Regions:
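Extracellular/periplasmic, surface-exposed regions of secreted and cell-surface proteins
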Residues: 1-225
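Short, intrinsically disordered, charge-balanced linker/junction segments flanking boundaries
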Residues: 3, 236-241
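Aromatic-residue-lined binding/catalytic grooves and analogous aromatic/hydrophobic interfacial grooves
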Residues: 171, 231-232
Length: 241
């Protein structure tokens, strides 16, 4: 409105045959607003200012990445087992080797963004600044089943939520002097990641020294705290006891 007040909004519905029927479709809205402050009367006549815009947005994006096309296929495996007291009494049976979570649905990345655009001195000085909070809910993760389930496969399930927060900025200076021109930029980002929750009270997910645990970054490196390194044989002998 009046080149000062800006708003955009979208809604989309996506479908993926990778999900079971009940979770196949997801609806993902997004909205963005902006305020071109430099168009206000109290800033419009400031000669050195070219742009000053405050903007904010919130949107939801769905993801089915990492899901195999055959996720809904149940696999049956043939195994041999001894029944009774006679070790030679071997019976062949069929077991369900792949357990499926028929409640699978879309991951949802919900992001809030607050930003500022600034240009001055005939567009030579520029600044772009963003603060964001991105929460990913219903994260698809493989879970380990107990051995009594008979399954050797770790099925996918929507069990976790994680959050990323941080800032991004880009400061630039552009100069033209006849046939000579140059651009200078200073770019910076920060990122803080942590697991917000895991459903079903599951234990931490371990992959070697990398552990995913509520309250800590995804796949954080865990290990013993080191007090020091032995420098010579004498120190080893003195601390052997």
């Amino acid at each position: 409105y009046d080149n000062k007040y800006l708003i955009t909004a979208t809604v989309r519905t996506d479908g993926s045959s990778r999900f079971p029927v009940n979770g196949r479709y997801g609806t993902f809205p997004a909205v963005g607003v902006g305020w071109a402050m430099h168009e206000e009367n109290w800033l419009k006549n400031v000669g050195w200012l070219n742009q000053l815009k405050l903007r904010s947005s919130y949107g939801v994006v769905g993801s089915d990445a990492g899901i195999p096309n055959n996720i809904q296929t149940a696999y049956v495996n043939r195994v041999n087992g001894v029944f009774g007291r006679d070790p030679a009494s071997v019976t062949t049976s069929e077991v369900l080797d792949m357990v499926i979570d028929y409640g699978l649905h879309w991951e949802e990345a919900r992001q809030f963004d607050l930003g500022l655009d600034f240009r001055a001195l005939n567009n030579r000085l520029t600044l772009e600044f963003d603060y964001y909070i991105k929460t990913t809910a219903n994260i698809l993760t493989n879970i380990t089943l107990p051995g009594i389930s008979g399954s050797t496969y770790s099925p996918l399930s929507n069990i976790a939520k994680a959050r990323n927060t941080g800032i991004e900025f880009n400061i630039g200076w552009r100069e033209n002097r006849g046939d000579f021109s140059y651009d200078l930029s200073l770019i910076g980002t920060t990122l803080k990641n942590k697991v917000v929750s895991v459903n079903q009270n599951l234990p931490p997910l371990e992959n070697g020294a990398n552990v995913t645990k509520v309250g800590y970054p995804i796949g954080g490196f865990w290990g013993y705290e080191v007090l020091g390194i032995y420098q010579n044989k004498q120190i080893i002998e003195e601390t052997a006891s």
